[in-house]
Amino acid sequence: MKIQMIAVGTKMPAWVETGFTEYQRRFAKDMTLELIEIPAGKRGKNADIKRILHIEGEKTLAAIPKGNRIVTLEVTGKPLDTHELAKNMEKWQLDGRDVSLLIGGPEGLAPECIAASEQKWSLSNLTLPHPLVRIIVAESLYRGWSLNNNHPYHRE
């Protein structure tokens, strides 16, 4: 199964790329994690945020391969503990489809992305910086994968 993380924002600090890549490379051949970056719209003093969100949403949806399961990361989504995420990942694999995880920009995801979502996942009630979310999600996915594959990474 391939999991695509489709995230609004480019030009992340080196520590973000290093952290994401560290977990990305750990997956075995049966599970791959790919990052697709969507350029964020320019946000200035008088920016039309609704329009920017719409454009980001169109670009995000265009990056999703046909047939992929769409999972959005949202504050209002369902919080998952490690075991619940692992069970979800197991279901995703049995479903036979690849997964696109959508991460919005500073104002979140466009309404059209949320509408296309099959599952909404909340990482936390905290507001997290978007660069850090990439690493947290990559690590969480790796931890879930390790649980499903009896890999010693996760310890109770």
Curated annotation (Swiss-Prot):
It holds the Pfam family SPOUT_MTase. It catalyses: pseudouridine(1915) in 23S rRNA + S-adenosyl-L-methionine = N(3)-methylpseudouridine(1915) in 23S rRNA + S-adenosyl-L-homocysteine + H(+). It is an enzyme of class 2 (transferase). Keywords: Cytoplasm, Methyltransferase, rRNA processing, S-adenosyl-L-methionine, Transferase. CDD domains: RlmH-like. Homodimer. Belongs to the RNA methyltransferase RlmH family. This is Ribosomal RNA large subunit methyltransferase H. It comes from Pseudoalteromonas translucida (strain TAC 125). The gene is rlmH.
